[in-house]
Amino acid sequence: MGSIGDVMSGEIVVVAPEDTLGEAAERMAEQGVGSSVVLDSGRLIGILTERDLLKAVAGRVHTSEARVREWMTSDPVTASETDSADEAIRTMLDNGFRHLPVVTAGRTVGVVSLRELMRAALQVDV
């Protein structure tokens, strides 16, 4: 199926730990993505996903006040652009993830989604 770099889209939403959940959700909706990476001084410190936002809303959290740092997954598992797509799928399934930040040479270059990986797998198998 190839590498993660062959599969992932170039779209990435970056938020800061002090951004509100509302700000993060707005950016994610504008870009049509299900996750955002949380950077602090250019360093990946977390990931915020649709699931995190749903948990906050279900808990009746005020998204205009709650901060990303309170709801993000800290120190997320990452992959490299050169990792195989099969390896990424296994990591995601084993850990219950749908989004995996992609880091190359210490720089966050994207996020690969399970949907992107499955789409690529189905195109190869057809």
Where do the PLM segments sit?
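Histidine- and aromatic-rich ligand-binding microenvironments
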Residues: 20, 52-53, 67-71, 84, ...
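The conserved cystathionine-beta-synthase
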Residues: 14-32, 39, 79-96, 103-104, ...
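A glycine-centered beta-loop-beta connector
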Residues: 28-31, 36-52, 92, 100-115
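A short, polar/charged loop-to-alpha-helix boundary motif
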Residues: 54-67, 114-126
